[in-house]
Amino acid sequence: MAGERSMAENGLAVASEPTADEAVWLADPDVQKAVSTIRKASKSAKPVLPSSNLELDLGFDSMERVELVVALERELGGEADDRVVSQVYTVRELVDAILQARGSKPGARPSLPGWDAVLATDPDDPRVLAALNSSRLLAFGWFLFGRLVALFMRVFYRLRVSGKEKLPKKGPFILSPNHQSFLDGPVVASQIPWRLFKDMFYVGTSEIFGKGLLNFLGRTFRLVPVDPDSNLVTAMRAGALGLKQGKSLVLYPEGERSIDGAPKKFKKGAAILSAHLSVPIYPVALDGFHDAWPRGRKFPRLSKLRVRFGDPIEPPAAEKNSEETYKQLTEKLRGRVLEMWRGLRENAGAKRSVAAD
């Protein structure tokens, strides 16, 4: 045991110090600036080494990585290609990518703080632009299909919906439901009135909507397929562009389907877009969808579905958005969705109790 402990301690000591090659790299003044920026942004107590993994060692999630990249680009004066940045994992890889890009483009990002710099540039991906500008005729076709979905769900899934009167007369806004199953999207869309439906758009994972028939169908109802992990910047810029055009975005803040049906941790994408574009977020609570089509099941089964639309959450009127702004707005959104979801479950439980009596 003592020998194992000694080996672990020795291994830790070695891992806490840079190698000779890394020490040479760290001696560069630009690298020192970059490492200082990374150290300030990291929430981890671990030392920032060239080999440190941005996610596993330093705790940067996908959103925080984008913010870090912007800070480094502003500090070093280079703008790395988003596709290159999405493929780096360590401190050294990230810093080298930005240093190598310095001078290869007309100039660094505008001197704006954080997400302002990211969202100041519109996406140039033709797939994004095509999806956002699909025809109104196609939208009407999907709207009629949604009426059939709503009727089918009311008859066979005993769908019950409340709070639709809280939806605004017009956009732009963000609609944020919790995510339980593949039924969520069609059912929520089927409840949107035409005045809003005609200008709705969606950001979906390219894992599902990136190719084949689903990719074709997605483009016809304004779904932008992106990889939120490796191409988060494109996803956020697509959301921002649509909102700037007066459209309204359906965005699932959990980013994936719940394992057990309960709302999980919310990502801050909706909060960032709301704060920077000054648009409200309308929370939506879904229940019963997980019972109908849980993860791992090939086909859905019959189960009572419930949807509740909530009051809008307005972004704070702050002159400068900060990490604390995003955190508070995200917590408020999750708290509102969780409260409504619990209300739906309590009502369902009370009705089952009355029926049993």
What are these regions (language model features)?
Residues 1-7, 234-357:
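Non-catalytic C-terminal accessory region of glycerolipid acyltransferases
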Residues 132-163, 212-221:
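A transmembrane-helix-recognition feature enriched in membrane-embedded lipid enzymes
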Residues 72, 175, 251:
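Conserved S/T- and glycine-rich ATP-binding loop of Class I adenylate-forming
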Residues 94, 151-155, 225-229, 260:
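Short, flexible loop segments at the rims of nucleotide/cofactor-binding pockets, characterized by
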